[in-house]
Amino acid sequence: MAVKKFNPITPSRRQMTMPTFEEITSQQPEKSLLVSLKSKAGRNAQGKITVRHRGGGVKRKYRIIDFKRNKDSIPAKVATIEYDPNRSAYIALVVYTDGEKRYIIAPAGLKVGDVIVSGPDSDIKPGNALPLKNIPVGTVIHNIELQKGKGGQLVRSAGNSAQLMAKEGNYATLRLPSGEMRYVRIECRATIGTVSNPTNDIVNIGKAGRKRHMGWRPTVRGSVMNPNDHPHGGGEGKSPVGRPSPVTPWGKPALGYKTRKNKKYSDRFIIKGRNAK
């Protein structure tokens, strides 16, 4: 998929780029797979801000995605490739031979008219989903389960893929996009191929207004706040931080500070961390 540039008729247009959406085949989503999505604006159930800089944005509906891919041995034909405002990857509407319709994460190269299928006896081709024990070593995969039957949780964003490196006993070794090597149970499912929209990471937003349409609000630097609002605030003019290192609004180190729990249950499954040399 290509990226479109614009003539520099305004300062923001000079830098802006946008996907060409040449893979998209339908503008109208399947109504039976839509649900209302209330804007949370970064608030939790108590109304407190848990994610800063969120709010506003264009109204959107949530598309119900089939991450489990548990409709085995029934072929499904790809009806449309669609844009999903809730994720970076494109989605595909598939129609099973029994008439049921579902959305799936569209892998790269999937086209309208292609036939996909789930189950342990499926062929190794993009879009098919099967347990890791039935996938050959070296295969590129995405939408990977961490628990059998729970649905894919890993490698779902645009252009990403993991690789099946080895299988031993009850576990398969995967290399994730971050560089992390980890064990996953071999009965967990994954989908063959790479996630669609690989050029998503080189798109330049170009202007603040386009970011506001996505539901992001401005970020204010701590150094221009008052001292009661941020540890970096206060002072006359441009003042230094006044601490050994920059900190968050709540006083914790902001750069290079490890926030992962050091006794997390999944540590036993991680062979090599994403930051390991």
Swiss-Prot record:
Disulphide bridges, residue numbers: none
Gene Ontology terms for molecular function: rRNA binding; structural constituent of ribosome; transferase activity
Sequence intervals crossing the membrane: none
Coiled-coil portions: none
A GO biological process held by the record: cytoplasmic translation
Region (Disordered): 223-261
KW Ribonucleoprotein (keyword) present: yes
InterPro entries linked to this entry: NA-bd_OB-fold (IPR012340), Rib_uL2_dom2 (IPR014722), Ribosomal_uL2 (IPR002171), Ribosomal_uL2_bac/org-type (IPR005880), Ribosomal_uL2_C (IPR022669), Ribosomal_uL2_CS (IPR022671), Ribosomal_uL2_dom3 (IPR014726), Ribosomal_uL2_RNA-bd_dom (IPR022666)
Pfam name, any one: Ribosomal_L2_C
The UniProt record lists the keyword Secreted: no
Described purpose of this protein according to its UniProt entry: One of the primary rRNA binding proteins. Required for association of the 30S and 50S subunits to form the 70S ribosome, for tRNA binding and peptide bond formation. It has been suggested to have peptidyltransferase activity; this is somewhat controversial. Makes several contacts with the 16S rRNA in the 70S ribosome.
PANTHER family reported for this sequence: LARGE RIBOSOMAL SUBUNIT PROTEIN UL2M, RIBOSOMAL PROTEIN L2
Complexes and interactors: Part of the 50S ribosomal subunit. Forms a bridge to the 30S subunit in the 70S ribosome.
Protein name: Large ribosomal subunit protein uL2
Species name: Clostridium botulinum (strain Eklund 17B / Type B)
Gene designation per UniProt: rplB
